[in-house]
Amino acid sequence: MDHFIKLLPKLTPHLRKGDCGKMGVIGGSLEYTGAPYFAASSASRLGADLIHIFCDPDAAQVIKGYSPDLIVHPGMTANSIIPKLSRMDAIVIGPGLGRNPNIWPLMQELFEFVRNRDVPFVIDGDGLWFVSEHIEKFPRQMSATVLTPNIVEFSRLCKSALGEEDVLNVRNNSQLQHLAAELSRKMNVTIYLKGEVDLVVTPNGEVSKCSTESSLRRCGGQGDVTAGSLGLFLYWAKKNLGDDWTSAHHEAGIASSWLVRTAGRRAFEKHGRSMNTPLLLDEIPKLVRDVETREMKDTVHTDSSKH
């Protein structure tokens, strides 16, 4: 919770629209319309001011129907997306992206944009599949970037980058941590490995862990919530820490992990095996409010103790 409190921006009368975050989510295809919504909605409920979704035209009308809060842009070409990203404080690619081969050229131009702008960048879902398929073309100067694999996506990355063939059968957390550190060094990028214990590993070998109790349900969409919230936390961390990306990745990673795990646990306690990702999202506003209320009480107690 401490990481969460540290990054949560104060709301004051002096803030303007956009000050708490403008985020772009790139994803959404004919088959997968829920994933980009989950990523965007998590950031919205956490406190982002503006969220743009860039998606396949086949998905646009469906996603627009989910929420009037989201700004939806049909079109999955570099020419239609890259110029709009200059206004974004953080970018997430992958939720519901699909595997159309035409997406890879977009990703290559996006990599160049992120490197030049040094903007917080999260790669999740099918974005990781493309990275695994084109590992030799993944740039090595992506200091602002975090990859967020689950174990299946992690195994693909390890096979492509490290030549490791049997990662899916690794159950020992120490072994997984060793592999994540090796992958982070090899790719020169931060790895946020989701699992029984979430690991955030930076290329310098530093490791942060979050084992906060979570939901026993493994329903689809929880990783999308992680990607969206992480993107926003990375922006807030950058505002606090400047260009110290190592610290920003650890702070934001653990804050996101704690948020998703705690919201999932609360939803599971209420709904049991019927719990799903929309129910997890419903827990985020109350969770944020609880954290803010506790912080206010702690501040009042601390101030009172000084007199």
Swiss-Prot record:
Key word NADP present: yes
Pfam entry (one): Carb_kinase
This protein's UniProt keywords: ATP-binding, Lyase, NAD, NADP, Nucleotide-binding, Phosphoprotein
Binding residues annotated for ATP, in chain numbering: 194-198, 214-223
The UniProt record lists the keyword NADP: yes
InterPro entries assigned to the protein according to its UniProt record, in alphabetical order: Carbohydrate_kinase_pred_CS, CARKD, Ribokinase-like
Entry GO MF terms: ATP binding; ATP-dependent NAD(P)H-hydrate dehydratase activity
E.C. number: 4.2.1.93
Cofactor: Mg(2+)
Catalysed reactions listed for this entry: (6S)-NADHX + ATP = ADP + phosphate + NADH + H(+); (6S)-NADPHX + ATP = ADP + phosphate + NADPH + H(+)
Gene Ontology BP terms: metabolite repair; nicotinamide nucleotide metabolic process
Binding site for (6S)-NADPHX: G96, N150, I151, V152, E153, F154, S155, R156, D224
Every YjeF C-terminal domain range: 1-291
Enzyme class, UniProt record, top EC level: lyase
Family from the record: Belongs to the NnrD/CARKD family.
Function field: Catalyzes the dehydration of the S-form of NAD(P)HX at the expense of ATP, which is converted to ADP. Together with NAD(P)HX epimerase, which catalyzes the epimerization of the S- and R-forms, the enzyme allows the repair of both epimers of NAD(P)HX, a damaged form of NAD(P)H that is a result of enzymatic or heat-dependent hydration.
Identification of the protein by name: ATP-dependent (S)-NAD(P)H-hydrate dehydratase
Organism phylogeny: Eukaryota, Metazoa, Ecdysozoa, Nematoda, Chromadorea
